Regions:
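Sequence/structural signature of beta-propeller domains
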Residues: 1-215
Length: 215
């Protein structure tokens, strides 16, 4: 099941990246036959990280900032008529991610696309990860992994702020979910926090075109 999609507008092929909200979901790329016709034919792929069956980092061997070589495996039955796309990808070496959620495309200072996505339950502590994929060099980087609920607890929806920082919404069933910012170099800060007597998540963060207020 797909959770979120993001279109790489810098890509001549019009690649569409997709997350899968599943404890063993894959990270997908759809390349349309016609760039401006996303409901038409195309090819579906799943990401494979070299030497890594899953990206959950259960042994804490991957450190924040580590970059890993990737490739893409073909999903031959994208409509899953006989087998789930997840199973097709895993059989070919696709790497699984734990609870992939929000996704956004940004552009770095080299004018290269970078695709950020969250894994709400990923990481050694199970508190969440943020991954950054660079299609120009086919590497994926562990941008952030939480070790403490007080710092970062199950990031979900994400966006890019007008000043270039990554903004992440927490969704952890508590009554104090936070809105967290990350600079491009990974420095984290808290923008706000829910104050409620009930469990409340933050979602759908965006900015107005005027760049002066929250959307």
């Amino acid at each position: 099941k797909r959770e979120a999609v993001a279109v790489d507008i810098n890509d001549k092929q019009g690649s569409v990246y997709q997350t899968e909200d599943d404890p063993s979901g894959l990270f997908y790329k759809f390349i349309p036959k016609s760039k401006n016709k996303l409901d038409g034919e195309g090819k579906l792929y799943a990401l494979s990280i070299k030497g890594l069956v899953n990206a959950n980092n259960s042994k804490a061997e991957i450190k924040i900032g580590d970059s890993l070589k990737t490739s893409w495996v073909s999903i031959l039955d994208p409509e899953a008529t006989s087998k789930k796309t997840k199973l097709q990808g895993i059989e070919k070496g696709g790497t699984t991610f734990n609870g992939s959620e929000g996704i956004i495309v940004d552009t770095n200072n080299l004018n290269q696309s970078e695709i950020y996505f969250t894994c709400k339950s990923g990481g050694f502590a199970g508190l969440g990860q943020i991954w950054r994929y660079n299609p120009a060099n086919d590497y994926i980087t562990l941008f952030y992994e939480s070790k403490s609920k007080d710092d970062f607890w199950m990031g979900d929806n994400i966006t890019i702020s007008p000043w270039g920082d990554l903004i992440v919404c927490e969704d952890n069933d508590s009554n104090a979910c936070k809105l967290i910012g990350f600079t491009p170099k990974g420095k984290m800060y808290v923008l706000g926090k829910v104050s409620s007597q009930r469990s409340t998540e933050i979602s759908g963060v965006c900015f107005s075109q005027m760049e002066r207020r929250w959307g």
